[in-house]
């Protein structure tokens, strides 16, 4: 009999606990709906009566701003954030409220309608300049590049009041740690193991913009970083970052490129990437829209051969490097041929070697080290000036940048770029294409010869431009000075062949150049470098 009574008491206690769990004393809405963009935090009023309550979200696209524990006997305005719903169907999640003492639970259903009407494959994404849907960005912090089905969004997880404006790019003010730029590209069928390349240019418009950022991509149900590529902040060893963005006295953009491979397939979904702020900053930060910079590029390598080797390459240069993103074109061409290239670039308009040696970002890029190749491009006329005057300051700067490069990358092969002639400034003051081109070529060769202890290779880009000009190829931009997209492709092809020394295969990428013109450019590049 005692045993029966004991069992009955135990059962009553169990039922009592269940009853407590069923009647958590809070007052909340049963269901909330947030917008498909969800740029601003949504406020949910929660009244805690008898005990403190812990708040959590059931899905990674949804989160709680600030403290996760609410005090008892108080009314709270809880902010929740959500990513845009980049799918074609409504989705739901739960906000769980759990009593700290009782363990009793109540849930709030959160629903979110879709942002996309349909999935239309958005690869490749190639953004130059400021071709964004600025009106959409300014109104709701989410937009698509013009002519693309890709999506760019601002996601605020910190609860800060974010301001989105368009000022020669996509600008955000007031970011807190954890807020992020989200990039998504609709994809109809991506197989497991397929590689994606992400490339962008970011700049700090004000001194107090967030400095440290981490790159992450969505795969296997979570956000993934690339641990091997992370660096440690000097002033705070707890900060492990992918890139840093800083306002310099003279603007110097952050140029970033990263490859990643998906372990799970995507069928009628989106490839998602984010740049997440690790430190807060009220100042303006933007995805640049400066003329002829790569603003954003996201590529997939659907039919590319497997990677046969991986090499790390440094690009130091000026506008003759950054117009149309020649380092990124090099990376794209190499991957289409089965070579993986990890790119680090420091590019700033008009810079000579001596000026790069005074730039924090250029020094940081060189000192990072571990490079297999370094493409060093002095300001374009310097080779011609050296051939004409033998200015000792030019060769002295060459020695200094070579020494710094090899100090941190002892096995690195240094490559100088023999650049091209142009009509600008009466052919740089030399009066004709022929005279300028002759000086540029002889000057590059003289520098390499007089610096023979460095075993420098000269990439004969200027020779390719000369042949292309004779064939009326549009290799110059409308300013008759910088490279056009076709000129950038010529430069990238010649640089590629200078490294790999093998002809192009049929799978080579055109990098956005028309197939017919791209083929002619490749033939010229092979003629110049390989003698074919």
Predicted regions and their residues:
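Terminal, low-complexity interaction segments
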Residues: 207, 223, 235-304
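Conserved catalytic region of serine esterases and O-acyltransferases that act on ester linkages
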Residues: 309, 482, 486, 492-532
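Extended extracellular/luminal ectodomain segments enriched in beta-structured repeat modules
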Residues: 178, 187-199, 204, 208-210, ...
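Alpha-helical cap/lid subdomain in secreted, periplasmic
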Residues: 365-485, 497
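Conserved SGNH/GDSL esterase-like catalytic core that processes O-acyl groups on lipids
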Residues: 312-314, 320-399
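Surface-exposed, low-complexity/disordered Ser/Thr/Gly/Pro/Asn-rich loops and linkers
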Residues: 145-192
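A short beta-strand micro-motif common to beta-rich folds, especially ectodomain repeats
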Residues: 88-101, 285
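Surface-exposed binding patches on compact interaction domains or structured appendages
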Residues: 23, 48-79, 222
């Amino acid at each position: 009999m005692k045993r029966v009574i004991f069992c009955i008491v135990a059962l009553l206690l169990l039922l009592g606990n269940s009853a407590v769990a069923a009647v958590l004393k809070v007052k909340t809405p049963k269901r909330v709906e947030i917008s498909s963009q969800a740029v601003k935090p949504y406020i949910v009023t929660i009244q805690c009566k008898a005990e403190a309550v812990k708040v959590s979200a059931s899905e990674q696209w949804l989160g709680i701003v600030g403290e996760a524990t609410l005090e008892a006997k108080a009314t709270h305005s809880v902010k929740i954030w959500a990513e845009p719903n980049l799918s074609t169907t409504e989705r739901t999640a739960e906000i769980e409220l759990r009593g700290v003492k009782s363990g009793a639970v109540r849930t709030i259903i959160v629903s979110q309608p879709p942002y996309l009407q349909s999935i239309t494959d958005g690869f490749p994404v190639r953004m130059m300049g400021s071709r964004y849907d600025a009106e959409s960005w300014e109104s709701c912090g989410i937009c698509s590049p013009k002519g693309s089905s890709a999506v760019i969004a601002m996601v605020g997880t910190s609860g800060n009041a974010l301001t989105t404006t368009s000022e020669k790019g996509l600008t955000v003010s007031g970011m807190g740690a954890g807020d992020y730029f989200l990039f998504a590209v609709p994809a109809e069928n991506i197989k497991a193991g397929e590689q994606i390349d992400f490339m962008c240019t970011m700049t700090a418009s004000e001194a107090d913009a967030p400095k440290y950022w981490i790159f992450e991509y969505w795969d296997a149900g979570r956000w993934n970083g690339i641990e091997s590529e992370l660096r440690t902040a000097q002033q705070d060893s707890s900060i492990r970052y992918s890139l840093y963005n800083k306002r310099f006295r003279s603007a110097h953009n952050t140029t970033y490129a990263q490859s990643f491979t998906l372990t799970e397939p995507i069928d009628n979904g989106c490839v998602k990437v984010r740049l997440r702020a690790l430190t807060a900053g009220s100042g303006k930060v933007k995805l640049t829209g400066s003329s002829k910079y790569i603003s954003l590029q996201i590529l997939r390598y659907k039919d590319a051969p497997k990677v046969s080797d991986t090499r790390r390459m440094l690009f130091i240069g000026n506008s003759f490097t950054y117009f149309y993103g020649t380092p990124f074109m090099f990376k794209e061409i190499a991957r289409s041929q089965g070579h993986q290239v990890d790119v680090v670039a420091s590019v700033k308009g008009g810079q000579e070697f001596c000026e790069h040696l005074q730039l924090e970002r250029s020094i940081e890029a060189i000192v990072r080290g571990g490079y297999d190749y370094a493409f060093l491009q002095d300001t374009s006329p310097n080779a011609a000036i050296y051939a004409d005057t033998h200015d000792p300051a030019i060769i002295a700067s060459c020695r200094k940048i070579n020494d710094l490069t090899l100090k941190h990358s002892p096995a690195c092969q240094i490559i100088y770029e023999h650049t091209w002639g142009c009509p600008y400034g009466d052919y740089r003051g030399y009066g004709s294409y022929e005279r300028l081109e002759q000086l540029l070529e002889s000057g590059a060769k003289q520098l390499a010869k007089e610096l023979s202890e460095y075993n420098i290779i000269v990439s004969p880009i200027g020779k390719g431009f000369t042949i292309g000009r004779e064939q009326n190829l549009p290799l110059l931009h409308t300013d008759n000075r910088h490279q056009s997209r076709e000129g950038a492709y010529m430069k990238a092809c010649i640089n590629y062949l200078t490294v790999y020394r093998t002809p192009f295969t049929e799978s080579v990428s055109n990098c956005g150049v028309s197939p017919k013109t791209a083929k002619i450019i490749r033939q010229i590049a092979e003629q110049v470098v390989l003698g074919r």
